[in-house]
Amino acid sequence: MKYTLTRANPDADQYPLQDRQIVTDPLEEEVNKNVFMTRLEDVLHTAVNWGRKNSLWPFNFGTSCCYVEYATTLTGVHDLSRFGAEVIRASPRQADLMIVAGTCFVKMAPVIQRLYEQMLEPKWVISMGACANSGGMYDIYSVVQGVDKIIPVDVYVPGCPPRPEALIQALMLLQDQIQLERRPLSAVIGDDLQPVYKPKMMPERDRKNAQRIAVKNLRSMDEIK
């Protein structure tokens, strides 16, 4: 008499000859529909970041001609209150957003750095204009070749000077970054030197590269306004 050994298949049906349909637990289905399971830390970070990105308080100061466009952005025509950034503060201790609008001179660099240090955490910086980004056309001894040489910058706005719409787009990009950040929920609890995670955002130049290359019919100089 011959014997054959067959290895058990754990994925096989328990009752292969039974035609009865196997359904999931109805209680489990109701729980999945009505109960949202997540970590409390993720919920708190999402809620706190939502509040931070929609209540930015810009610091009202300017270093050069780009401040004219910055002040134009604050007018009612552009309605900056849609983004929760209409509360302009004249004190660095009451602001959390610094917009460096214009040329950063060597004599002005210590002042900007001091003002940045006086701002409380969390704080962000927008570099507005070619001069603030890289010195612009002033490649001379008296101009700092980029404000990021003295303070960290989150968003760069190109242009000389940039239009108010460009600054609004920079504000929206900063809001996207703030939503993905992970900061200590409280400076009272835990160590003061807790790490701060800032996501690495893709530059708009790279994100819209394929869209620009796909354009074949360019407008003439007379049509550009």
UniProtKB/Swiss-Prot annotation:
Cofactor(s) needed: [4Fe-4S] cluster
One GO term of the biological process aspect: electron transport coupled proton transport
Gene source species: Acinetobacter baumannii (strain ATCC 17978 / DSM 105126 / CIP 53.77 / LMG 1025 / NCDC KC755 / 5377)
Listed GO CC annotations: plasma membrane; respiratory chain complex I
InterPro entries the record matches: NADH_UbQ_OxRdtase-like_20kDa (IPR006137), NADH_UQ_OxRdtase_20Kd_su (IPR006138)
Assembly: NDH-1 is composed of 14 different subunits. Subunits NuoB, C, D, E, F, and G constitute the peripheral sector of the complex.
Protein name stated in the entry: NADH-quinone oxidoreductase subunit B
Any one GO molecular function term: iron ion binding
HAMAP family (alphabetical): NDH1_NuoB (MF_01356)
